[in-house]
């Protein structure tokens, strides 16, 4: 229960419950809650509590009932945690635990709660590092639902093999550096998504060369449900149930994924995506919710095989309990946080809260494939076979920025000849290595609690260097302008941070301009934006996107890399030190890559009424011959940049100008 002047929010299938005492029949929101969602309750001051299962995630849940001792006060309730009624039996000596974590700040409390579950998982799992996963660390091309080539669309080609080979060639000729390609389910023998796949053998009409490395690229591969009539039924142990569209199953034999992943990695698989997770539990089958072992055994076997073969996992269409259980699955680095990006519905609106929830549990939130074309440019012949067959994308800047800043997979999905290279290169180096933020995109605390912004979709990603934070802020469907202050960005995570910052609007294809100074006493305003009305037939922007940077001790501001979503990506800048005399940066890049670093040397004049911030651009080019190599065989060089108010910024390949010791752990994270 809460006081009437305090708001209450919670995660419930991406639903915000609102104020506890103002939700009619509020108990109906919770009764029968069988999806395993954690409950986040908070007041307007940010005092928060998270309650969830701490074990047996597949078969546990919550319920609520009114407190009959006080029938007139609908703000009182009795909350229950326990096992689901879907269980048909419980073993002797069975134990179940729940956990309650309380703290100050919504982001901070969720992270503390996630730390607890990761520890209780007993597998030593840490939060994902975006540069420890080949797929997350590199630009890719995707063919799943919403992609141009979904369902094997290949107008003008004899088959999909020919289409993808030509696509690869065309992107190479355009210097668009994709490093892997995702195959969805359209190439394999199946009986549809449900009841599922029959085999992992390609249909000859799609891939004449069969299951082989004919493409010559690393692959992200996929499985929907598994049909109970698949070719492996007599070779491995399965749990099978009947659904209206036929029998469906999950493998319980540890050898199944060992053999499947051995085959996949033989042709270049670097990631395996398990889709339709929601259908295995509360959805069509109940395969994982009728006993206490099946779900655990199924995903544990998948994880052990992934570890054995050095690949990572993506969960797709998960319920909340799959995400909680992912704290025990070492190989899962990301999970889908939206519906399929078919441009038909506003599924991207869930990215803020899900980004926060997912990362608290150790994984990154994925928002699916993206198109890069300009507004209303039709991609003729696309494979979007959903009802409205939308073959255009008018929200590309929002989709692409969110996909990159969330730290989930960034997979372009345009048809050949449609890809906007300018937009794509906001994401990565010239060799296709991604430039990501250290902290992924997530809802900010004040969007839950503060009366002037409550309910606003305001998300931010961050890069931190010591006490200095650079933020990338996105507002979606804002009905009013939202005030932003330095403390609203820091959220108590950094002590001694600068209280004066600058901000500018991010506009694709344009350099940094229109820089404004803001502070605690003089906030900047995130402008209001239009709703995501479909089919996006509106002239005004559906989102607002600001970048923000601190004023450093010498009065300068390093705005960061021009024309990148993460202007100060920790994948580019491995060291920054700021003193009252100078700012020193160590940066890494691909051979012969040129970067543009925007900075301001005159912010100390900010109190002058006539002050107009001046932006300077420093252009640096990395050597053509680099000698260092990262874990993915990417060559890279280092450049040092020194900035002083009087002389501006200058770059050098000479290590002698670097007076700062490199932090080993930061260097290791990107290499």
Where are these predicted regions, by residue range?
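Solvent-exposed beta-hairpin/edge-strand motifs
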Residues: 492-511, 600-624
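Aromatic- and carboxylate-enriched substrate-binding clefts and catalytic-loop regions
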Residues: 11-15, 26-27, 172-409, 414-417, ...
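Carbohydrate-binding surface patches
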Residues: 403-411, 448-500, 504, 543-553, ...
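C-terminal beta-strand-rich structural cap/linker in extracellular carbohydrate-active enzymes
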Residues: 518-574, 593-597, 625-671
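Carbohydrate-recognition beta-sandwich/jelly-roll modules
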Residues: 1-180, 198-206, 218, 271
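Short linear, low-complexity motifs centered on an aromatic residue
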Residues: 132-134, 161, 169, 418-435, ...
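Aromatic- and carboxylate-lined catalytic core of secreted/periplasmic carbohydrate-active enzymes
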Residues: 312, 400-412, 417-446, 539-559
């Amino acid at each position: 229960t809460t006081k009437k002047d305090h708001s209450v929010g919670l995660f419930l299938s991406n639903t915000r419950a609102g104020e506890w005492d103002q939700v009619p029949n509020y108990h109906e929101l919770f009764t029968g809650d069988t999806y395993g969602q954690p409950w986040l309750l908070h007041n307007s001051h940010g005092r928060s509590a998270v309650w969830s299962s701490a074990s047996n995630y597949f078969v546990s849940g919550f319920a609520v009932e009114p407190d009959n001792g006080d029938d007139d006060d609908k703000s009182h309730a009795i909350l229950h945690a326990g096992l689901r009624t879907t269980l048909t039996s419980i073993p002797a000596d069975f134990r179940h635990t729940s956990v309650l974590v309380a703290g100050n700040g919504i982001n901070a409390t969720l992270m503390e709660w996630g730390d607890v579950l990761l520890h209780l998982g007993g597998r030593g799992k840490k939060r994902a590092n975006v540069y420890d996963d080949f797929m997350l660390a590199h630009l890719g091309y995707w063919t799943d639902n919403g992609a141009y080539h979904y369902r094997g669309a290949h107008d003008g080609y004899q088959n999909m093999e020919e289409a993808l080979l030509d696509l690869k060639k065309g992107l190479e000729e355009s210097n668009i550096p994709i490093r892997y390609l995702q195959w969805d389910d359209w190439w394999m023998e199946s009986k549809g998504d449900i009841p599922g796949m029959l085999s992992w053998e390609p249909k000859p009409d799609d891939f004449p060369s069969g299951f082989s490395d004919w493409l010559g690229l690393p692959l992200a591969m996929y499985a929907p449900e598994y049909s109970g009539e698949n070719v492996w039924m007599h070779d491995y142990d399965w749990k099978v149930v009947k659904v209206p569209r036929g029998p469906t199953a999950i493998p319980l034999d540890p050898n199944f994924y060992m053999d499947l992943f051995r085959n996949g990695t033989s042709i270049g698989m670097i990631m395996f995506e398990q889709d339709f997770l929601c259908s295995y539990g509360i959805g069509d089958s109940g395969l994982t919710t009728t006993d206490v072992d099946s779900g655990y055994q199924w995903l544990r076997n998948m994880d052990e095989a992934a570890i054995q073969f050095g690949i990572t996992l993506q969960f797709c269409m998960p319920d909340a309990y799959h995400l909680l259980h992912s704290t025990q699955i070492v190989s899962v680095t990301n999970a889908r946080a939206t519906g399929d990006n078919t441009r038909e519905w506003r599924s991207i609106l869930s990215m803020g809260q899900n980004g926060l929830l997912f990362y608290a549990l150790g994984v990154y939130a994925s928002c699916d494939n993206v198109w890069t074309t300009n507004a209303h440019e039709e991609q003729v012949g696309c494979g979007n076979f959903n009802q409205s067959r939308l073959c255009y994308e008018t929200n590309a800047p929002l989709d692409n920025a969110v996909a990159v800043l969330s730290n989930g997979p960034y997979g372009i999905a345009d048809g050949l000849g449609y890809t906007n290279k300018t937009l794509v290169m906001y994401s990565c180096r010239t060799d296709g290595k991604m430039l990501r933020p250290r902290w992924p995109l997530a809802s900010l605390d004040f969007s839950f609690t503060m009366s002037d912004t409550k309910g606003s979709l305001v998300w931010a990603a961050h890069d931190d260097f010591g006490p200095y934070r650079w933020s990338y802020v996105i507002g979606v469907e804002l009905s009013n302008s939202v005030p932003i202050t330095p403390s609203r960005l820091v959220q108590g995570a950094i002590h001694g941070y600068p209280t004066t910052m600058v901000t500018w609007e991010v506009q694709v294809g344009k350099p940094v301009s229109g820089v404004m100074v803001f502070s605690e006493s003089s906030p900047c305003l995130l402008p209001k934006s239009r709703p995501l009305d479909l089919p996006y037939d509106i002239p005004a922007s559906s989102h607002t996107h600001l970048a923000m940077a601190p004023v450093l001790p010498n009065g300068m501001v390093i705005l960061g890399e021009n024309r990148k979503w993460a202007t100060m990506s920790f994948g580019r800048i491995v060291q920054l030190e700021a003193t009252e005399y100078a700012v020193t940066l160590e940066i890494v890049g691909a051979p012969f890559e040129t970067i543009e670093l925007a900075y301001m040397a005159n912010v100390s004049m900010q109190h002058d009424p006539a002050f107009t911030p001046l932006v300077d651009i420093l252009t640096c080019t990395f050597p053509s011959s680099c000698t260092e190599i990262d874990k993915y065989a990417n060559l890279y060089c280092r450049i040092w940049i020194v900035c002083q108010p009087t002389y501006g910024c200058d770059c050098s390949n000479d290590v002698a100008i670097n007076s700062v010791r490199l932090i080993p752990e930061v260097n290791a994270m990107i290499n």
